Regions:
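Core alpha/beta structural scaffold of self-assembling particle/tube/pore-forming proteins
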Residues: 1-59, 67, 71-413
């Protein structure tokens, strides 16, 4: 019998090809824009006055007429409460010891976990800075009956129109927020389930999506899924700031005198329509008119699917030019403002933002907790070590009227 790879298998070696390969999208456009306007703050909460109304004690009169009644300027107080983000790792002593050195492993376990957590924190924040404080990942579909089950039909949340599983992966621990009522913060929210672990997530052939939990879970139609403990604890996002209703930073947008606290929203009642240059210009002009600044929009941001729609508008006349960013990257523009695209952005939506009006308030920047002099701590009764990252602060705009959001844009995912 001739020698073959089968008979010689015990002698053959594996040839290892260097470092760990990255396959995850690490682009964090919104985080980079926000972090460029970061501010160090402190105290119980952030407070600043906002001028929302003029003194209208003016008018013309006849000779010797009674002077206008004295009025006053109108101010409101905006408040920003801090939020607290954490990222935690744990590595066994065996994994640490057995991964030391290039000959033992592709990467040392503790260094790899700490480095990946640092990157993951940026990616987590990037998603959060779009979708905001409620922490939506997806919702239970309308055809899901209210039962104890392990397999749950899901659909996109109202702020995550499109693929409902793009922020879900196996191993996540989720809470289900009750969709009924008018919850606006942690004190008013109720849950349909808590701390359920995702075993798998599947997109079916028909486009239906399911999440399979590791144990039976009580679900109802419309339940909003978030990472456990994160409901209304996430940092505020641009969807919170670029809105025209509700209360933002303690100021009611419903009050007529506070209309300058409303952002510019161009929707189509939930029906998608083609993107046009005229639609973009309408939104641009709305923000310019509301703010009194012709070039108030500094960036437009959208999902990659909308980039294709935008390029289709420009290609027939070859009217697009690309700006060059640091590192040589090229970006499109509209009216001279950068038009940026990334995977975490909501589908079917274009944001127009005034970057100087947005602030990433930092009480504590991203850091590994080491008040006791060590980043790592022993886990009680186990030969294992753990550490955690943290960042305290919040995110928001002090001029919502300088920003716009176009929704219901037709785009192929």
């Amino acid at each position: 019998m001739p020698a073959t790879t089968t008979t010689f298998d015990a002698v053959l070696k594996d040839w290892f090809l260097g470092k760990v390969r990255d396959t995850l999208n690490e682009k964090v456009t919104m985080f980079e824009i926000a972090n460029a306007k970061a501010e160090r703050v402190g105290g119980r909460r952030l407070v600043y006055p906002v001028h929302v109304g003029r003194n209208f004690g003016v008018g013309t009169r006849a000779e010797r007429g009674t002077l206008p009644t004295a009025q006053n300027e109108v101010y409101v107080t905006a408040t920003v409460s801090p939020k607290y983000w954490y990222g935690r790792i744990e590595v066994s002593a065996q994994a640490m010891k057995q991964s030391q050195g290039d000959r033992a492993a592709f990467a040392e376990a503790m260094s790899e976990e700490m480095d990946r957590m640092t990157r993951n924190s940026r990616k987590y924040f990037n998603r959060m800075l779009y979708f905001g404080s409620r922490g939506d990942l997806c919702t239970v579909a309308s055809d899901q009956s209210s039962v104890n089950t392990t397999t749950v039909n899901v659909t996109s949340s109202t702020v995550n129109v499109g693929s409902p599983l793009r922020f879900i992966q196996a191993g996540m621990i989720l809470d289900g927020l009750n969709a009924s009522g008018a919850a606006t913060d942690t004190s008013t929210v109720s849950t349909d389930f808590t701390s359920s672990t995702v075993a798998s997530a599947t997109v079916g052939a028909s486009g239906s999506s399911t999440i399979t939990f590791s144990a039976t879970t009580t679900v109802v139609s419309g339940t909003i899924m978030t990472l456990t403990g994160c409901g209304y604890n996430d940092f505020n996002g641009i969807d919170d700031g670029i809105d025209s209703s509700g209360t933002y930073q303690g100021v009611s947008r419903a009050a007529y005198q506070n209309k300058s606290w409303r952002a510019n929203i161009l929707g189509n009642s939930g029906t998608n329509r083609p993107l046009t240059l005229n639609l973009l210009q309408q939104a641009w002009d709305a923000a310019s008119e509301a703010s009194g600044e012709d070039d108030t929009t500094t960036h437009l941001i959208s999902h990659y699917s909308v980039r294709r729609e935008y390029l289709d508008l420009l290609t027939p006349d070859v009217r697009f030019t690309a700006q060059t960013l640091k590192g040589g990257h090229k970006v499109l523009d509209f009216n001279g403002a950068q038009f940026r695209f990334e995977v975490d952005a909501p589908f079917n939506t274009v944001y127009g933002i005034n970057a100087p009006s947005w602030h990433l308030y930092k009480i504590s920047d991203f850091e590994w907790a080491d008040e006791d002099g060590s980043v790592l701590s022993r886990v009680s009764n186990i030969d294992s070590f753990e550490g955690f990252m943290r960042m305290f602060g919040n995110f928001g705009t002090d001029a919502p009227n300088k920003n716009f959001r176009i929704t219901d844009i037709q785009a192929t995912l």
